[in-house]
């Protein structure tokens, strides 16, 4: 599997075809998709500008990676911290105000690039940790690795992961590709290859 921006690109093509955009009250678009750090700069912003619109003036654009956890009722859109980053400070400020109506904690990223890569890195961490748990289980077949990892997880700075038949939904295996896609020095990320 490889990451694709095809659907995101198609949505923005449709948005840009809408010609009645008010320059007095420019629309705000918050992208929640899993992204590489450079997809807005390399693909989406040029597409918007090719259609005669100026990002930050005619259209406000930012990123707020989705965070949800369906297995725990205490982890909701309201309680999970949201990361936001706009293409300029004004957009970020607006995103904080809008998402602050719903979310208890809104965290400002330096900009849209920093916000964009958050979800990919979160998911890549998760994949590495679960893969390691699975490998430990195979490497030590005579040890109850679930039990050992539960004990390991009692240390304050180590997460608790358990061996399983997989590593998560469709997005988890894609995460390393998103991280690598935007990296200038891909060879430095040998764990993700």
Task: Name each region found by the language model.
Residues 1-193:
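Structural/interface elements that position substrates and couple domains in central-metabolism enzymes
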């Amino acid at each position: 599997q490889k990451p694709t921006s095809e659907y995101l690109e198609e949505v923005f093509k449709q948005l840009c075809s809408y010609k009645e955009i008010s320059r007095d009250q420019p629309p705000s678009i918050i992208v929640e998709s899993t992204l590489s750090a450079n997809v807005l700069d390399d693909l989406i912003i040029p597409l918007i500008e090719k259609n005669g619109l100026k990002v930050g003036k005619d259209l406000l654009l930012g990123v707020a990676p989705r965070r949800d956890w369906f297995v725990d009722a205490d982890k909701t859109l309201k309680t999970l911290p949201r990361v936001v980053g706009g293409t300029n400070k004004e957009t970020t400020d607006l995103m904080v105000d809008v998402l602050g109506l719903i979310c208890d904690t809104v965290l400002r990223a330096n900009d849209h690039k920093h916000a964009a890569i958050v979800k990919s890195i979160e998911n890549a961490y998760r994949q590495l940790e679960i893969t390691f748990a699975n490998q430990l289980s195979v490497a030590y077949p005579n040890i109850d690795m679930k039990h050992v990892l539960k004990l390991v997880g009692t240390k304050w700075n180590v997460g608790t992961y358990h061996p399983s038949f997989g590593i998560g939904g469709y997005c988890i295996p894609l995460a390393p590709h998103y991280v690598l896609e935007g990296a200038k020095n891909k060879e430095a990320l040998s764990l993700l290859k």
